[in-house]
C-alpha cells in the first residue's frame, strides 16, 4: 500500500506522536509498503527527504514560536533533545512566550499549529495529485492535522481516511486548546465534520470512545480503540552513566501538561518521605527525564529538602530514555486529571517489568486500568497524600528494591502493544 501520514512533527522532534508513528512507519516500510509523511518545516532540514525509507515532506510552521526559531536559525529548541532546560530560558524566550500567551493564544484557531494549515493543505493536495495513495492517516493533536486530512478527503472521496485521535478536541475543557468563549460552537462543528467524513476513527482508550459517543451520538460505531505502542526495536544507549551505583533510583519519564498533569503531588509525597523516613535521604535519587516548562519548574523550587536528591535531565534521545528505564530501580507515573487520556509511555512502563509508583488523579483511572493486575504497582490518590500514603511508599520501596518481572511475564503482558500488532490494527482499519 502507498500511505500518507499527516502529523505536525517528525524526527528530530521528540514527542509521543513522533515516537508512535515513526515506529509504525518504519514497520510498514519493512513490510514493503510505501510511506509518506507530511509534517512542518524545521530550519536546517530539507523540505523533502528520506529517513529510514520514509519519504518526508515538510511545509508550514509548527507554531508561532517555532516560526521565530526558524527565522532566527535557532537549533536548540523545545521538544528536541538538547533543548534548553528551564534554568537556561533567556529573556527573549520568556518574552516571546508572554507575547504568545497574551495575544496570539486568545485569537488563533483551531490550535497553536494553525500556521501549518494553509501550506500543509496545499502540499497535501499536491501530493494527492502526484501519488495515488491507498490510504491516509491524520494524527491529532493538533486538530489542524485533521483539517488538512478533511481537505484531502473532500478532494478525493475515494481515498480511505483514518482519523487517529491521540488527544480529543472539541469537548476538552481541562486544558487550553483555543479560546472557547469565541470558538466553542465552531470547535464542535469542525470536529463533527471530520468525524462524519472519516472512514475510520482510532482512539487510545475505551473511555475516549465512550466520551466521543456522548458528545457525537452514533459515531462510536466507527471508532476503534488502538492502545499505546511499545517499540521493541529501541535499543538502550550502551554508554549510559546517569545513575550512581548503590542508590535507589526513582525515575519519571515524560512531560508535564499543566493543569492536567503536574509534579506537585509527587514532590509533596517525596518530600514527606524524606521527612518521615530520613533513612532514604542518603540513597534515594529522583530523576525527571523530559521537557520541563519554565512555569512548571517553580514547583520543584518549593521543596528545598528534595533538591540534593533531584536530577532534572531535560529532554534526551530515546536511546537514553531506554537506558534510564533499564537501569532505574523504580518508575514513577503521574496520572492525568482527565479520564479520556492514556499516557503513551504506559506501554513502555509495562514492558520494563520494573516496580511502578503511580499517583492517581482521576476516576476512572486509565493507567490503573491499563496496568490491570500488575503485581508491582503501588497506586496512591493525589488528594490523599499524607502520612499513610508516605508509609505505604516507604514499605513499597523496601519490599521491591531491585525487583523485576520475569522475561516471560513481561512478554505475555506486552505482546498486544508491540509495534507490529499496532501497525496491523491500523492497516485493518484502512482496508
Model-derived regions, located:
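A conserved catalytic-core segment of Leloir-type glycosyltransferases
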Residues: 40-118
